[in-house]
A protein has these predicted regions:
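Signature of the first transmembrane helix
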Residues: 15-77, 115, 237-263, 386, ...
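Membrane-interface junctions at transmembrane-helix termini in multi-pass inner-membrane proteins
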Residues: 144-167, 354-382, 425
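Hydrophobic alpha-helical transmembrane segments
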Residues: 167-217, 385-389, 403-427
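Interfacial segments at transmembrane-helix termini and the short loops linking adjacent helices
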Residues: 50, 118-138, 263-264, 304, ...
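Interhelical loop/hinge segments that connect adjacent transmembrane helices in multipass membrane
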Residues: 2-17, 186-196, 208-250, 293, ...
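Transmembrane helical elements of multi-pass membrane transporters/channels
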Residues: 20-39, 168, 172, 195-215, ...
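Membrane-water interface segments that mark the loop-to-transmembrane alpha-helix transition
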Residues: 20-31, 57, 69-119, 303-324
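Helix-loop junctions and terminal segments of transmembrane helices
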Residues: 69-85, 157, 272, 276-301, ...
């Protein structure tokens, strides 16, 4: 019996796909641990208002950065696939350079918008004098932020998978961690947001240098220009719509909380959201692992095999997430108290967010199924519907219920998106995405 188990374990570990998946999972878990360690440091050493400003600017970069990127970070892999089997590094480099130029122009337009915008508009909406200057500074470094995100996905396209995962999950936190520690030592905590922005400038420069280094490692032969700028945008933007919608869905609650409850509430709520991301990382990692298998089996019309894959992934996701969900639901105060007694204010929001994410876990591969089976536009419509619901619920609930309202809005829209996808797939393909 033990020999049989040992044989299967060794066979599994020796599989290159499994080894890559395990290494990716290990790096991502380490990244989550690093993020939570840094969050603990911030909540212990910095005033909640400063932490709230940090999370507010970070959310702005995520949401608006996804728009400035126009989906290039996702479509770079698509263009590499389009070039296969007659793959040329030179062609991919030309695509990359055009993407960088268009990212720069989009970032420049954003910066000019804030230069020309009357500061009183932002001041009146958020009811304070600091928000405009925070957003202005963030828009000034948007190009470097977008460049860092794009470069990491270029690493993946160049098959530097480990480097890509390290930057995406670990290295991107190191500059801000170092700067945040130094600010505490120098008693300059007020400059936390500036440190965050400088860290993205640093990451943008470093990843660009590495990108050109990886391009020069191989011979780049390119005699023609494969894709025009117009074609790049045409192919990239539809791919990005669902991603942008999801980022915005994770931003509306922060924006409305800042408007109605201030930066401290943003800090408290952001901790609850980060705890919820523990569950989403598990779901995302497993779905990334099975997405290629879903695409291949569906393409070959092996519907029974697709059903088996999605059911196995659903069982695995639930098996791993359920203990974490139960733990967070039973001990929310114990967990939040690690971040400081003030953060207990997010207890109700945490419970709702965890319940919502736990419910979504039962839908397994819903986040990737439609994209992997050629129904990207259907998925976009579902996610855009969820985004509209998210905005309406945040608009109506946060003024009255604060953090709890934001948690209800996010959980309801996430459940709508997963349930809508599962319902469509069952109706069209006869595939049960939900655990059964």
């Amino acid at each position: 019996m033990l020999k049989t188990i040992r044989y299967y374990l060794l066979t599994t570990v020796q599989n290159p796909v499994v080894r890559q998946s395990l290494l990716t999972l290990l790096i991502r878990v380490f990244g989550v641990v690093l993020l939570f360690g840094f969050t603990l440091f911030l909540t212990q050493k910095y005033d909640p208002k400063l932490v709230g400003q940090y999370d507010f600017v970070r959310t702005f970069l995520f949401a608006i950065g996804s728009i400035c990127l126009l989906g290039f970070d996702q479509s770079i892999l698509y263009f590499k696939g389009r070039l296969y089997p007659n793959y040329s590094l030179g062609h991919l480099k030309k695509v990359y350079l055009k993407m960088v130029l268009m990212l720069f122009l989009a970032s420049l337009l954003l910066f000019l918008f804030f230069v020309l915008l009357d500061a009183s508009v932002i001041t009146l909406f958020f009811a304070d004098n600091t928000t405009y200057f925070l957003l202005f500074k963030a828009s000034a470094v948007m190009f470097f932020y977008g460049l860092a995100i794009l470069n990491v996905e270029v690493f993946r396209a160049l098959e530097e998978i480990v480097v890509a995962e390290l930057f995406r999950n670990v290295f991107k936190y190191l500059p801000i961690i170092v700067l945040a520690v130094l600010l505490v030592q120098w008693q300059l905590e007020l400059y936390l947001v500036d440190a965050l922005l400088l860290s993205f400038v640093f990451l943008g420069i470093v990843t660009t240098v590495l990108t050109f280094y990886f391009f020069t490692k191989k011979t780049a032969i390119c005699t023609t220009d494969c894709f025009s700028a117009r074609e790049i945008i045409t192919q990239s933007f539809p791919i990005a719509v669902s991603g942008m919608a999801i980022f915005l869905m994770m931003s509306f609650d922060i924006l409305f909380l800042k408007k109605y409850q201030g930066y401290a509430a943003v800090a408290f709520y952001s901790v609850a959201v980060k705890l919820m991301t523990l569950l989403s990382v598990i779901i995302l990692t497993i779905n990334i692992t099975v997405s290629a298998s879903i695409a291949a089996s569906f393409s070959n019309k092996e519907i029974e095999k697709v059903q088996q894959i999605v059911q196995n992934s659903s069982r695995l996701i639930v098996a791993i997430t359920l203990p974490a969900v139960i733990g967070l639901l039973i001990f929310p105060e114990f967990v939040l108290n690690f971040f400081g007694p003030n953060y207990l204010a997010a207890k109700e929001a945490l419970v709702v967010l965890v319940l919502g994410q736990g419910f979504c876990a039962f839908f397994g591969s819903a986040p990737v199924y439609l994209n992997m089976t050629g129904r990207q536009r259907i998925f976009q419509r579902i996610v855009l519907g969820a985004l509209g619901l998210n905005f309406i619920l945040n608009y109506w609930l946060i003024p009255s219920y604060g953090m709890l309202g934001g948690a209800i809005a996010f959980s309801a829209s996430a459940i709508f998106w997963n349930f809508g996808t599962a319902l469509f797939v069952y109706y069209k393909d006869g595939i049960k995405l939900f655990l059964s």
